[in-house]
Amino acid sequence: MKRKETFGFRKSKISKSLCGALLGTAIVVSVAGQRALAEDMTTSTTSAVDTTAVVGTETGNPATNLPEKQADSSSQAEASQAQAEQKTGSMPVDVATTELDEAVKSAAEAGVTVSQDETVDKGTVGTSQEADEKSGEIKADYSKQAETIKITTETYKADVAANQSETNRINQENAAKKAQYEQDLAANKAEVERITNKNAQAKADYEAKLAQYQKELAAVQQANSDNQAAYAAAKDAYEKELARVQKANADAKAAYEQAVAANTAKNEQIKAANAAIQQRNAQAKADYEAKLAQYQKDLAAVQAGNAANEADYQAKKTAYEQELARVQAANAAAKTAYEQAVAANTAKNEQIKAANTAIQQRNAQAKADYEAKLAQYQNDLAVVQAGNAANEADYQAKKTAYEQELARVQAANAAAKTAYEQAVAANTAKNEEIKAANEAIKQRNAQAKADYEAKLAQYQKDLAAVQTGNAANEADYQAKKTAYDQELARVQKANADAKAAYDQAVKDNQAKNAEIAAENAAIRQRNAAAKADYEAKLAQYQKDLAAVQKANAANEADYQAKKLAYETELARVQKANADAKAAYDQAVKDNQAKNAEIAAENAAIRQRNAAAKADYEAKLAKYQQDLTQYQKDFADYQSKLKAYEDAQAAYKAALAELEKHKNDDGYLPSPESQPFIFEQEKNATLEITSGDKVYNADEFYAEADKLDYIKADTLFNTEKRRVAYEHFKGGIQDSADWPGKRVFLPKGKPVVARYSNLKNSELNGKKIASAEFIYTLKDTSLNADKIPAMLYDDPTQTIYYFEFFGSQSIDVDIKFYDEDGNKIDATGALLDFSSLNRGHGWPQYNGINTIEKVNYHTGTAIEINGSSVKDNGDGLYAATPNYTKANQSRFESNEWDTTNSPVNWYGAIVGKQTGPDIKFTLSAENASGIWFAFDSKIKAKDIPNKPMESEPTPPVAPTQPLEPVYEVEKDLEPVPVEPNYDPEPTPPTRTPDQPEPNKPDEPNYEVEKPSEPAPIEPNYDPEPTPPTRTPDQPEPNKPDEPNYEVEQPQEPAPVEPKYDPEPTPPVDPVYEKIPDPVNVPTVRYHYYKLAIQPGVTKAIKNSDNLDIDKTLVAKQSTVKFQLLTADLPAGRPETTSFVLVDPLPSGYQFNLEATKVASPGFDTSYDEATNTVTFTATAETLANLNKDLTKTVSTIYPTIVGQVLNDGAIYTNNFTLTVNDAYGIKSNIVRVTTPGKPNDPKHPNNSYIKPHKVNKNENGVVIDGKAVLAGSTNYYELTWDLDQYKGDSSGKESIQKGFFYLEDYPEEALDLRPDLVKITDTSGKAVTGISVTDYASLEAAPEMVREMLQKANITPKGAFQLFTADNPQAFYDTYVVKGIDLTIVTPMVVKAEMGKTGGGYENRAYQIDFGNGYESNPVINNVPKIDPKKDVTLTLDPADLTNIDGQTIALNQTFNYRLIGGIIPPKHAEELFEYSFDDDYDQTGDKYTGQYKAFAKVDFTLKDGTIIKAGTDLTQYTKAQIDEVNGRILVSFKEDFLRSVSVDSAFQAEVYLQMKRIAVGTFENTYVNTVNGITYSSNTVRTSTPEPKTPEDPRTSHTVVYRPIKDKTYQPAPPQTGQLPATGDANNAYMPLLGLVSLTAGFSLLGLRRKKN
């Protein structure tokens, strides 16, 4: 690769924006860019072409010039191409008739009848050579006709005299023969009449029986059909209704059983709850009775007053007993009704059983009864269903009410139980409290008891008298009782208060007994009056207490009596209900078991019935199928029988006819028949099972072309090769009528073609299903070991193989197989070997010595009378030429060598198989291609097909099956009705005891509280009676299906009688024919007409006049169309007009002037609206054509010149020739394409030519759109898209326009690295022959480059890099025509200045091929601005943003320089390898303390996914170099750490350098941030230190001299809060832990320089 340098002005292309915004560019087309294409053409054009049109944004074409999509073809072009190669009309060819005219005239004068036949049409030929041949044939025939007419005329005169004498002799002999014949004929007529009458009677009897049979058959079939349809309909309705009823009953039963189960479970729960209640009640009762004993002692007197309660109890008891009797009566009535229902059901079932018996007896009329009962059944079923629905609704309503009542009772009982249990618990707790209180009271009352007993004795003595007086007090008792209750409450409270006071008083009393003694005397005096009052009240109390106790005793006795009766009745009811339930449960269980048995038995019955029905229906279906088949077979049998008889008769007649003609031309010498039918199999499927490759047409032609069968080593052989290969190409194209597979026949290796799906063929009475054709190439004269062949999908079209004027022999082995895959014996088959030509071909290439042969190996050859093909011992072929009469042939080839020719036997021979396999060898010599068709269509005349040998067998009629008698299913037992259980009696209610009268309080005594009375047992509501389901009505009895009468099998149709044959009539006597009078002979003659349709050919050439048909050329290439016409023949009419019209394809730029120059002899006109050019022969040209009409004349042709102007376009074209307005012909279609057609169905991977560009980093990673650091190298990879040009046929003028690739790079952002440029091909091989030149601007480029870019409509924005193919032809031959893409890698370095300003830059490229430009995609990148900052801080906290830049720092104050590095944005193009902080501080004012820290300024991510948060201490990943002598510190991040940062992550760090101010003055400081080799300066900070106000004490200065030591990586100490890591020693001798190093020598190596203020 050569390199050139050019310098000049540059123009800015950079946008200084960190986001990399793309600047829009307006494309301006200069006036200079509008130049006409005539600059590149040898002649001027009619219209200029703008080759600088902008990129086709709408079409998607990246072309910079001529981007337009090819427009649709004109309607004229489409119509012309749709009629390609079609012809209309013709030109007549005249032949002289003088000799024939004279012979006709002479015959008429001699008395011979002369008749002129219709003029014979000799057809229409296509070439003047063929016209000359036909004219010669016509002349010869005219001479032959003239000679025949002369001979006929002379013979006629001699025959007339001899005819009369012979006629007289024959008449006498014929009269005797006629008399005998008439006698025999009368006898025969009588016999014929007798036999005819007999046969007529037999036929009438047969037809009568046949008519009766068909009538009866139709009636039986209709009856069976009606019966079956009615039965099926009724049965279907019954089964649907039965299924519905059974499902409804099953659902109802399931719901009922669920309700029963739920009720049972609920009752069990209630029963368990009641049992628990009874247990608790029993316990409560025991407790109660114990308490009651004590209570009864105390209430004996009160019970006497309760006698009135007895009357109330008796009334209630009477009512209870009446209700109990009513319930028991109702239960008895329900039970009776249930038993009656069961009995009625049983009786009903018995009735149904009896009715079923009667029904079975009446089945003779079953069908009518069945239908009537079925209707009644459906009505009854509807009633039952309605009743069941009503029962269900009633049941559901009762069930709902029952469940609601049950829920209410259970809730009430639960509440009562809860209240009762709470009362018991409260009572127990209260009694325990009272018991405890009573114990205390007893202790306190021990002393008082003695006093009380003494007083009681006196009280009882006085009580008797008091009780008598208290009778009057009863009336006001109740009023007093109310007051008593109120007073009692007050007293109880007072007593409680008194007790508390008393307790205290007791304690006080024990201390003050002495004082109390005096007080007691006074108390006793006061108590005397109280005692009198008390005793009076006590007497009344005792009287009232006795009355209450008496009444309560009566109540208790009444309650106990009622309770005993209740418990007795409850036990009875519960036992009765339990017994009823057990009986019901057992009945249900028995019912379920019984119904299970019935259901199982019914299931078995249904199964047996279903099996019987299925078997019957299967047999019936089989019978009906067999009957249908029988009827069909019988009809088929009759047809076959008739066909057999007709075929036998026709066969015998045909053999007899062949016998008559066995010596005639076209017939076989002995009668033969054909047992082989193999005429057409259009739907056959062809497979090449030998594994040989099947080619498409292009592959096939390419492979044959590569084999080079005819070497083009001489001019003669070149033309011979062209003709042979054109013939080959035409013979291998796809055709809807002749589909096939293209294979090569290798020498010595069989190629097996297997045909399946054969439908129309037979062999020896067996159907042919498949066949195998095995071809083996034995020998070939070609210089190759294989030859091409077309094997057609229809095996009767067979094979078309190509010889290329050589000779070959091919063994053919054919096997036929039946439908079971068995091979069929071919013995006896007649094989057709026809169209065996000899003496045809191209004289200049094979000397008309072509010969076609067959060597038949598996049978005998039978020669056809008169055929030119004979068995010559070494094969079957024509011993002499049979192509033209001029070469000894009896017929012309076009007379016999067609499928429908009546004399096609002339080139045929027949082979008769004597063995099971078919084998023969095909061979030919000196032919271009041979079509061989193997079929059974024998060319010998009237060969009949051999009929089947045996008479067809009549079918056997099937036997109809009998319908089975189905078993009847049993009805299920009805479900027992659940009994109505007796409700439990209502327990008696205890009459509450009367309260005891208030006993007067003993004075000063605390009375024991009585026990709380036991709570009264709650009155439980009786459980409601669950609803009783109304039993479902039983399903109505299904009527039994009638036992149908079994149909009698049909009588077989009467067989047509064998009629007596008529007697053979007497043979007509053979009269000796009297000689006809000598007829006046008629001589016939005819004239001929001949026409010609001269052919036309359209050729397409490039600028080098090379054929480019069906190839591609570059856009803007010159394409020339040649409109060729064949020679015009002798005998043609005068040519008065000769016009050629060519509708040009769209996108083709026609050059009128150049076309006129290339088309002398024609007037040329152009219609721009239709893009059509017309050529009209000039008068001079017409004169040359008409100069001598008796001789063949050659024509001249015009040439169209123009350019193709579209990418990815297809240009197809043909033209029309019109001669004398009588003959017209459309030419062939030629085609040329331009590269880059998208969505081309023949080349689906095509696309527009599009150069491609990507930006990669040094590791080959694509970095398009990513941030690129200054100093980085961009490795731009450019693709030169050349694969679309593969197979290009452009001319040299297009190639010489050159091949270029332009890189339009932004020179403001990038510096070229031409030393690193690489160019490779798709295999990675280095490309040579390309020069690369750098131009500073378009103006700096040479004129040739500027002109080339202007024509391609490409304007670089500034500097550009141009790659140029040094030798366009060599470059074209090496890469373009082979379609090899090239890859250019051109590295460029981002300028350092870009890092300081930041901004985006854009880059794109162009390729220019053949003068056509194509634009690549743009590549855009951003350069981040690196802007380091410097602050002065007093703290180490990264979150503290306080900056004291510009402020005052005290002398000896410690502070920090904060160095903030530039931010590296996310998604940067390459790894970081350098990131450092270089601080050149003023050591005269600042002293480094030896301590620094590095922190993350932003969150960033490592390659392993670790996230480092902002503020993280990064000191351990750094190293420091210190030069205190010169005031220099360099802190650098380790390279391995930097490279571990993900390129998808941002990165920024900051460093704190701790300083101490050691001098007075103003000090400035700036640091340098280095990123990947590029340095960036920070801002400058300034701080001032004033003179201290108070001088410091003088100190003895201590100077420490540091010696430089080797660099040491920083190892941080554990951080301390608020302090930097110390790097000095304990005496602050300024020795940092990391090791301070004096690096004077080291910095000099690094090139560091100190900055002074």
UniProtKB/Swiss-Prot annotation:
SUPFAM superfamilies: V-region of surface antigen I/II (SA I/II, PAC). A motif (LPXTG sorting signal) lies at residues 1620-1624. Residues 206-616 are annotated as: Heptad repeats of Y-[EQ]-X-X-L-A-X. Residues 982-995, 1012-1034 have a biased composition (Pro residues). Residues 56-93, 107-137, 975-1073 are annotated as: Disordered. P repeats lie at residues 960-998, 999-1037, 1038-1066. Residues 72-86 have a biased composition (Low complexity). It is found in: Secreted, Cell wall. The modification Pentaglycyl murein peptidoglycan amidated threonine is found at residue 1623. Residues 1624-1653 form a propeptide. Keywords: Cell wall, Peptidoglycan-anchor, Repeat, Secreted, Signal. Its main location: secreted. Pfam families: Adhesin_P1_N, AgI_II_C2, Antigen_C, GbpC, Gram_pos_anchor, Strep_SA_rep. Residues 996-1011 have a biased composition (Basic and acidic residues). Residues 1-38 form the signal peptide. Residues 629-951 are annotated as: V-region (lectin-like). One of its GO terms (cellular component) is extracellular region. Ag I/II A repeats lie at residues 150-224, 225-306, 307-388, 389-470, 471-552, 553-634. It is a peptidoglycan-anchor. The keyword Secreted applies. Belongs to the antigen I/II family. This is Probable cell-surface antigen I/II. It comes from Streptococcus criceti. The lineage of its organism: Bacteria, Bacillati, Bacillota, Bacilli, Lactobacillales.
